[in-house]
Every structure is written in C-alpha cells, then in structure tokens.
Amino acid sequence: MASFTEEMQKPKLRELLETGIQLLEEVEAATQPTGSKPIQEKVREALKLLEKASDMLSQLDLFSRNEDWEEIASADLKYLMLPALKGALTLKLVGSSKRLGLLQDAREHFMNFLTQTHSYHVADFQLPWAQSSSMEGNPAATSDAQEQNLVAMASQRQTKIQRYKQKKAVEQRLSSLKSAVESGQADDERVREYYLLQLRRWISISLDEIENIEQEIEILRERDSLGETSASRSSPQERPPLKPFVLTRSVAQAQVFGAGYPSLATMTVNDWYEQRQKNEVSPTLQEAEKQAPPSETFTVSEKEEPDLEQKEDEDENALHRMQEWDDWKDTHPRGYGNRQNMG
C-alpha cells in the first residue's frame, strides 16, 4: 500500500516534460542576464526535471530503432524532444572555467536528438558529421582545396537560408495550433501535426547550435594552446652567462696610441716606496735636522720695536690735532669772518 502511494506521489513523465519546457520558455523570455542567480536556478531545475524524464523514458522503452515516426503514438512524439531540450538548457549554464565541458555536453545532447530523429525519418536532413566524413573520404573533392572551400561555403549559406525560411514557416504554423492543443480541443491529427512541427523546429535549432558549438570549441582550444605557449615562453630558462666582447678596432688603436690617458699604474705606492728605500740610503737623524729649514718665530725682533713706538707717536699726534680742530669749530661757527657776504 505504501509503495502504491509513493508511486502516485511521483510526478508523471508528461508533467516533468511540460514543466521543463515551461522553465525553458521562461528563461528565454526573461529580461535578466543569463548569468544571474534566478535564471541559473531555473536552468538547473529544468535540467534536473528533464533528466528524471529521460530516466523514466528509458525505463518505459517507448521507442524502437526499427520504427518510423508514423508508427509512434501522437501523444508520445513530444518525448523525442528531450535530448534537444537538455542541449539548449546546457548551453545556458554559466561557468567560464567549465565552458568547454558544457559545450561538449550540449553537443552530445543535440547529436543524440538528431541521430534519433534521423533514424525515425522525422525530417529530410543530413547529419553534419556524416557530411564532413564523406567530404574527407572523397579524393576528388580534396584535389582542389580552394575550390572545395568555396563550394562548401556557398552550399552552407544556401542551406542556412533555406533552413531559416522553413523554421519561420514552422513557427507560424505552431502558433496557430498551440492554443488548441494545450487546451485539449484539438483532434488527434492536429496534435500529431503540432508535435511533428515541434520536432522539425528543434532539428533546425540543433543543426545551427552544433555549428556554433564547433566554432566556439575551436576558439577555446586555440586560446588554451596560446596560453600554454605563452606560459612556456615566459618560464625562466637557464642560459649561459654572457661573455665580454672586445672591439678589434679598439684593441688595435690601444696598441698604437696607448690607452688614451698619460700612463697606466704599474705598481702601488707601497711598492714604489720600498723600491726607493732599496735604491737610496735614508738620511740619519742629524743630517735630517741640518737639512730641515729653520723654524719660524713669531716674536717681535729688536729692529721692529722703534717702528712700533714711532707709529704710536704719530697716532697720538693725529688724535691731538683732530681734537684741536673740533675745539676751533666750536668757537668759530660757520661763516665766521665773512663780513662782506663774499664767497
């Protein structure tokens, strides 16, 4: 009884798929950045629900490899979209350090979806990896690489244009069928057409996303290789020490004209002094006193004494005359003796 109650409480496969699709539509219609926390939480929740739906689908074993899409029930066609939905949600996960791994996981989901829909003949398209392998194995196609690239680019451009037009037509038809199918008023034929158009729409999206993923993976790998190369170049390497170099012209010039200054020192001062002591006899103490000049004395000689006395007398006479002149000016004011206003 308890197991039956638990089974009844478990979400159904249809509910898991519809909730996952609803969360994906909310993420795509949101105005917030994809890397924001609310958006990332919705992406992870949707992936979790779709993973549960995939596990339940594998246990139910609804599809067979030998079937065609016409043999699948109309209500079961929508479950073929599970790998494509997981691939679209994986691309919306944010993580710069894990970006390469996320791209590889998303590519694997899209490849599983395309392989499954191609085997059921849901739409007429060619698998991208099968097309590239056939071109590589054709020797005639590889004879002229430049011409092959031009033809491939033109064909790829035309395919993208055609795919875009088909996608717009499918989306327009889906918008007209969506309300009737979701409300349960559509008959089995319209329900079948609606889910078949949904599968073809996701086929077009998956083909475009795989091309974009391949380009981004190539860019990331080139960036990583450049980073490793720059890191190896920047790592310090042991190098032999640089040897001094001598210009031949400078050596020849020095041999002819010398080193460029008066002389080069050939011995130290101590060596010169020792050599001088060996060649000459050092004078004795008495001879050194005789050769020494007489010491200067700062005492006043007898000849200079009269000169000093005479200079002092002259200074006293000059001072006496100046005093007499000052006294005369005091007794004789300015203009004294000029009685006739002369001068």
UniProtKB/Swiss-Prot annotation:
Similarity remark: Belongs to the IGBP1/TAP42 family.
Its localization reads:
Cytoplasm
Tissue and organ distribution:
Expressed selectively in brain and testis.
Species of provenance: Mus musculus (Mouse)
User: In its UniProt entry, what is this protein called?
Assistant: Immunoglobulin-binding protein 1b
Among the record's GO biological process terms, what is one?
A: B cell activation
Keyword terms: B-cell activation, Cytoplasm
Subunit comment: Associates with PP2A-alpha catalytic subunit.
Q: State the GO CC annotations.
A: cytoplasm
Q: What is the lineage of its organism?
A: Eukaryota, Metazoa, Chordata, Craniata, Vertebrata
Q: Where is the composition biased (Basic and acidic residues)?
A: 317-333
Q: What is its main location?
A: cytoplasm
What biological function has been recorded for the protein in this entry?
A: Associated to surface IgM-receptor; may be involved in signal transduction. May be involved in regulation of the catalytic activity of type 2A-related serine/threonine phosphatases.
